[in-house]
Amino acid sequence: MFRPGDSRNAAVTGAQRPAPSVRRVTVRLLTELSAPAIADALGPDSVLVLPTGAIEQHGPHLPVATDLITAQSMAELAVAEFGEELDLWLLPPLAYTKSNEHHWSCGTFWLSAQTMLSVLHDLGSSMTKTPARRLAFLNGHGGNSALLQVAARDLRIAYGLRTFTLHPSLPADHGGKSPESELGLGIHGGHEETSLMLHLRPELVDMEKAQRWVPEQLTEYRHVRFGGSVSFGWTSDDFGPDGVIGDASTATAEHGKEKTEAMLAYLGEAFAEVAAFDPGPRS
């Protein structure tokens, strides 16, 4: 585990590290147990938490590991806060995921949809060798959402697992919020993500390069727009040369802290329901 303020990058080292906090974060890491200890510690209602991030461009001001850092940090904080009570166990994060909407940019590393689904299927198969039967994807990248929904159902059918997908922070194209300065269109590298990173990993943010790049032309359409009733295929360079879709210039660490606290509160409620969920008696 890293200590708050450590400038090394988890995406490079592969280490587990908490988000900055007043206290040291202690996390229930499944990988720190032996195989027999896992068999003894877990039961059918144990919840394995798999953070799913991404390695992709986030403009000139944010690191390519932004989504990974967000997903892993929130998973660590949630498992540290609620793990004992709800029997949550943290898995290592899935860093390389479905990011080909940023395929054009240096620094983006992605899996095809088919490969990612195969990886998730194999992880689900591996999970069946443990006593746990609840798997929760804690997702930090909007581009993963559709595939995680497919994988959740496939794993339910193939292995009888209880599967869940949690989104602590949704972009505007998936129903999340975007400030007025972004016209409700901020989905990538803008106010929300930059604020989060200013709180979680401020040493990795270059606010001198933060900019506003909002696709205002989309406001001309009622249905074909981010979060509209008609979705459309896009890549991030459709809207500007640096891949930013939003207003990073307005980001603050204070907003990032408030957002982190709100996300953690949501995760506490959501994981409580995940741990107790039963769809009901079968007729």
List each model region and its residues.
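Extended, histidine- and acidic-residue-enriched regions that form the cofactor-binding/catalytic faces
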Residues: 2-134, 142-283
